[in-house]
Amino acid sequence: MATEIPPAVRNDLDRLRQLEDQLQAVLLRKQQYEGELRNVDKALNELNKLPQDSKVYKVVGTFLLSTTRDEAIQDLNQRKELLDLHLQSLVKQENMLRKQISELENKVKQVLAAGQGGQVQ
């Protein structure tokens, strides 16, 4: 006779799947921000090589606008700060989710190993 998974364990497994989905979403956003941060760093590196009185262009929507080198550097530094803050937040979320996943996995393993199936005795 097949053993049925108790409702409490089923709920824990559902919660585990939700946490893993959330972790994947956080990791994807983190990866996107890291890519954007690399692009910002490359742009800053190139701008810093230019003479101070250089004119540069930036894309705003569907327009290409002229700006000064210093304004472009300032804009990119602000964007970099914002990306760093987002990344710090995502790292905290990632760590929290990993901890919750680990705790829930251990709980489910203990219940299943004990053969109690989550039932109260």
Curated annotation (Swiss-Prot):
- Pfam families found in the cross-reference section: Prefoldin_2 (PF01920)
Entry GO MF terms = protein folding chaperone; unfolded protein binding
Q: Which UniProt keywords apply?
A: Chaperone, Cytoplasm
Give an example GO cellular component term for this record: cytoplasm
Superkingdom of origin organism: Archaea
Does Chaperone count among this protein's keywords? yes
Indicate the principal place this protein occupies in or around the cell: cytoplasm
Localisation: Cytoplasm
Its annotated function is as follows:
Molecular chaperone capable of stabilizing a range of proteins. Seems to fulfill an ATP-independent, HSP70-like function in archaeal de novo protein folding.
| Entry's family note | Belongs to the prefoldin subunit beta family.
Matching PANTHER family: PREFOLDIN SUBUNIT 1, PREFOLDIN SUBUNIT 1-RELATED
Whom does it interact with, and what assembly results? Heterohexamer of two alpha and four beta subunits.
Kindly give the HAMAP family that the UniProt entry links to this protein: PfdB
Protein name according to UniProt: Prefoldin subunit beta
Give the species: Caldivirga maquilingensis (strain ATCC 700844 / DSM 13496 / JCM 10307 / IC-167)
Q: Which gene encodes it?
A: pfdB
